[in-house]
Design a protein with these regions (language model features):
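Bacterial N-terminal signal peptides that target proteins for export
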Residues: 1-9
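Bacterial N-terminal signal peptides
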Residues: 9-19
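Extracytoplasmic small-molecule ligand-binding "clamshell" domains
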Residues: 23-102, 289, 300, 304, ...
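Bilobed "Venus flytrap"/periplasmic-binding protein-like clamshell domains
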Residues: 38-47, 57-72, 106, 126-182
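Extended ligand-binding regions for polar small-molecule ligands
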Residues: 63-66, 70-72, 135-138, 142, ...
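Acidic, polar ligand-binding/catalytic clefts
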Residues: 66, 70, 74, 78-143, ...
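Short helix-initiation/N-cap motifs at beta->coil->alpha
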Residues: 79-91, 174-189
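C-terminal functional modules
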Residues: 273, 279-340
């Protein structure tokens, strides 16, 4: 009897296994019902999430929002961008106000383990730096002892700054603001001698200064800042969609697939390529998406390199070198799990 019961339980379990594996995401259902993706972004950070002269959102983090919408709806424009300060961002995600947070956010132990959040991956490897005016003649961080430093509230930046100065017996005068715009104004007016932020953020802040050429970014880097999108814990289906959307963009670059040449690869003899773009595969089903989900991401948004270069790289005013964000095969550490 016991053996028959065990056999019955096993049979039922295996019968249900596909259903459990393909269980619909509650967040995906919500997103489909509302007909758009609610994506949390910054209040304005050039290169990552900012509004252009035509009133359109643009940036590396915005591209991720659009890639996710393209995967879900087949339309990258079905996104509502919700600007959030660093102080507001996690509460907005936890409460369900937004479906995903794509806002230059550092992946840390505490955030990942105590706040009900899941980090999707890394879309920009960064580090904390400092920007000063050229006329200050400051060349290194130690020269900022007892000086006023502008920093954004509720960020790892402030915590790193405290740790760095305490560990070296240095002091500083914190000048704390909620937004990047406020920090730029304070620096322009001379309220602080230096700004500290992720180096990518410093590049963005510098181009928005009244005289960008008057500021210099120091070579000192005091932290690791892996930045990436975030979703709520408790919805593995949605987490999978969010994670593999980023992986598609990175893998597409590695395979040499761009938005421009994508259709030429439909008849490729490379199974990695045909698998990625959905030729004769059903990978989308396991995510609750159509089988051309990856095709739509690449066609409408592009691969990771395309996104990087137009927003923060050589085709942008920021001109940030790829550095660590180059592919692992090109001297960087950018890497995504294989899609197979």
């Amino acid at each position: 009897m016991t053996n028959r019961l065990i056999a019955l339980v096993c049979a039922v379990s295996f019968t249900l296994l596909p259903a459990l594996t393909l269980a619909s995401s509650t967040t995906l259902g919500k997103v489909l019902k509302q007909g758009k993706l609610n994506c949390g972004v910054s209040t304005g950070l050039a290169g990552f999430s900012d509004i252009d002269a035509k009133g359109q959102w643009q940036g590396l983090d915005v591209d991720y929002c659009q890639a996710l919408a393209a995967a879900i709806f087949g339309d990258k424009n079905k996104v509502e961008y919700i600007p959030l300060t660093a102080r507001e961002r996690f509460a907005a995600l936890q409460s369900g106000q937004i479906d995903v947070l794509s806002r230059n956010t550092t992946w840390t132990f505490e955030r990942d383990t105590t706040m009900g959040l899941n980090f999707v991956g890394v879309n920009f490897y960064d580090g904390q730096g400092f920007m000063v005016s050229k006329k200050s003649a400051i060349k290194q961080v130690s020269q900022l002892h007892n000086k006023p430093i502008c920093v954004q509230a509720e960020t790892t930046t402030k915590l790193n700054l405290d740790d760095y100065f305490v560990s070296r017996g240095l002091n500083y005068q914190p000048v704390v603001f909620d937004t990047a715009v406020q920090i730029s104004r304070a620096f322009n007016s001379g309220r602080c001698v230096a700004i500290t932020a992720d180096r990518s953020g410093l590049y963005a802040l510098r181009i928005n200064l009244a005289k960008p050429e008057s500021a210099v970014i120091l070579s000192d880097i005091i932290s690791k800042e892996p930045l990436g999108p975030v979703v709520r814990e408790g919805d593995d289906g949605w987490f999978n969609i969010a994670r593999w959307t980023l992986a598609v963009m990175i893998n597409a670059e590695e395979l040499g697939i761009t938005s421009a040449n994508l259709d030429q690869h439909r008849n490729s003899n490379n199974p990695e390529i045909t698998r990625l773009i959905g030729v004769e595969t059903n990978l989308g089903q396991s995510l609750g998406l159509s089988n051309d989900w990856a095709y739509q991401i690449i066609k409408q948004v592009g691969n990771y390199e395309e996104s990087y270069q137009r927003n923060v790289g050589e085709q942008s005013p920021l001109m940030i070198p790829r550095g660590l964000n180059a592919l692992w095969s090109s001297g960087g550490i950018m890497y995504a799990s294989p899609i197979r």
